[in-house]
C-alpha cells in the first residue's frame, strides 16, 4: 500500500523529493502545493496524476492524506508543522525546521510529544566525520 502524501514547496528541494518518491514506488503523491505559478505549471507537467494547488490548507484538511512533505521556505515551516500536528499527519521536513532558534525549540517541544513520525532531512555531507570518510 502506498503512502498518500502532499508536498508543500516545489522548488529545487521539493522537486528532488518528488523525484525520489516517484522512484521508490512507495508514495502516492496526491497533492503538490506551491505559491509560484511557474512551479505549479512545472508540477502539472511532471506529475499529472497529482492535484496541483496554491493553498496548502487543502492538504491539511484532506483526512486521506497521511503525510506531508514540507519543502517551502523556513519562515513557513513552524506554522506548517503545527498544522500537520493538528491534522494528525506524518511529517517530512527540510531543514531548518523554523526561521529562528526559539521557534525551532518550540517545534522540538511539540514534536517530542507527537504520536506520528516527524523527520527532518538533515544532510550529513558537511559533517567532519562524513568528510573524513570521503578521504578513505
Predicted regions, residues:
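A contiguous active-site-proximal alpha/beta segment in oxidoreductase catalytic domains
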Residues: 98-136
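Beta-loop-alpha module in the N-terminal Rossmann-like domain of NAD(P)-dependent dehydrogenases
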Residues: 17, 50-110
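Short helix-capping segments at alpha-helix termini
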Residues: 24-26, 87, 112-116
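N-terminal Rossmann-like dinucleotide-binding module
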Residues: 1-47
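Short beta->alpha connector loops
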Residues: 11-13, 73-75, 124-126
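Short, Asp-centered acidic motifs that coordinate Mg2+ and/or phosphate
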Residues: 31, 66-67, 117
Amino acid at each position: 500500500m502506498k503512502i498518500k502524501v502532499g508536498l508543500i514547496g516545489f522548488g529545487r528541494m521539493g522537486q528532488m523529493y518528488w523525484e525520489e518518491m516517484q522512484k521508490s514506488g512507495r508514495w502516492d503523491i496526491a497533492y503538490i502545493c506551491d505559491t509560484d505559478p511557474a512551479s505549479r505549471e512545472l508540477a502539472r507537467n511532471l506529475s499529472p496524476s497529482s492535484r496541483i494547488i496554491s493553498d496548502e490548507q487543502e492538504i491539511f484538511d484532506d483526512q486521506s492524506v497521511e503525510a506531508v512533505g514540507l519543502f517551502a521556505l523556513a519562515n513557513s515551516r513552524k506554522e506548517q508543522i503545527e498544522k500537520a500536528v493538528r491534522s494528525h499527519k506524518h511529517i517530512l521536513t527540510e531543514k531548518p525546521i523554523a526561521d529562528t532558534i526559539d521557534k525551532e525549540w518550540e517545534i522540538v517541544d511539540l514534536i517530542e510529544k507527537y504520536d506520528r513520525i516527524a523527520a527532518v532531512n538533515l544532510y550529513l555531507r558537511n559533517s567532519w566525520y562524513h568528510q573524513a570518510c570521503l578521504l578513505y
